[in-house]
Design a protein with these regions (language model features):
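Active-site proximal loops enriched in glycine and acidic residues that flank catalytic Cys/His/Asp
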Residues: 17-20, 31-33
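Short, well-structured beta-strand-loop connectors
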Residues: 2-15
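Preference for solvent-exposed, low-hydrophobicity sequence contexts
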Residues: 150-247, 254-269
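Short glycine/proline-centered loop/turn elements that form peptide/ligand docking sites
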Residues: 2, 18-25
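A generic structural signal for beta-strand entry/edge sites
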Residues: 24-26, 117, 248
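Acidic, glycine-rich catalytic/binding loops that coordinate metals and/or anionic ligands
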Residues: 30-160
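A short, sequence-level motif marking secondary-structure junctions
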Residues: 5, 134-138, 266-269
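Short linear proline/tyrosine/threonine-rich motifs used for host-factor recruitment
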Residues: 120, 250-253
Length: 270
């Protein structure tokens, strides 16, 4: 990189070196609003980065690293990226093994509307699962349709997925309170919302294992949804999520000793 060059995202700015006065290589950088020497430094957060601690890896989003933090950019795993980088026109077909031995087939399609909102459409249940994505992750924004549908379970399973694989790393987030709550509880929460939130629906996804070889690649993940009222866990959903050969191969839903197994019976069609 030379003075005056135009930069784009992903360009290498510098290599980490040693000035001779430091015991280890390091790099200094700052953000400023104007290109002039001596301009004020902006106190600005970084989008997504990985914090490496003694306990393992931790995703940080829109935060600022602390002194002595060991950080790295998110290293994209192509298997995860291709599986969760949904493209309009892409189609999926899942066979769901339901409690009681029944089996049903569901066809989904990725759609973009005239406002460029992207969502997964289920023809059988007339349900929509809206999503957004950036260079580092895919995340669902909201669901419209039947809450007992396979698409809704997929919403709960893969609410937020980072494209990078870091073993045992956990992603944590929360759903809107009306996702799995209704009736009097929602009315009461709306009334006291300015003071405190006693309803919480927590989401957690954990990266379990990864296998790579010349002909195949696979990644296993587990996720959980925990509905809490006043700090007490009232209901839990447990999920597994399997990625094979760059596509979502299978996901399972366990709730109240009932298990739903959804198997992708064809690779995504473009």
């Amino acid at each position: 990189m030379q003075k005056g060059d135009t930069l784009k995202k992903g360009d290498i700015l510098a290599h980490c070196g040693n000035s001779g006065r430091s015991p280890q290589p390091h790099i200094h950088f700052q953000l400023q609003a104007t290109p002039f020497i001596g301009s004020k430094t902006l106190d600005y957060p970084l989008g997504h980065y990985i914090l490496n601690t003694d306990k393992g890896y931790e995703l940080k989003s829109f935060e600022k690293p602390e002194k002595d933090d060991k950080v790295t950019a998110v290293e994209k795993n192509q298997t995860l990226y291709k599986a969760f980088h949904f493209i309009p026109g892409q189609q999926f077909e899942f066979e769901a093994a339901l409690p009681g031995g029944q089996k049903k087939t569901y066809k989904w399609e990725v759609v973009a509307d005239i406002y460029n909102n992207t969502y997964i459409w289920c023809e059988a249940t007339h349900s929509k699962l809206f999503f957004k994505s950036d260079d580092d992750m895919m995340y669902f924004t909201h669901f419209e349709g039947k809450r007992r549908s396979l698409l809704f379970y997929f919403y709960l399973t893969a609410y937020k997925v980072l494209y990078g694989y870091y073993k045992d790393m956990e992603l944590k987030d929360s759903f809107p309170v009306n996702t799995l709550n209704s009736g009097l509880l929602i009315l009461l929460q709306d009334f006291v919302a300015p003071f405190f939130m006693f309803l919480k629906t927590n989401y957690q996804l954990k990266y379990i294992s990864k296998k790579d070889d010349f002909t195949d690649s696979s990644i296993e993940m587990q996720s959980q949804v925990d509905i809490r009222v006043g700090g007490i866990s009232m209901k839990k959903y447990n999920f597994t999520l399997s990625v094979r050969k760059d596509h979502i191969a299978e996901f399972t839903v366990t709730h109240k000793n009932k298990i739903v197994v959804a198997t992708n019976i064809n690779k995504p069609l473009s």
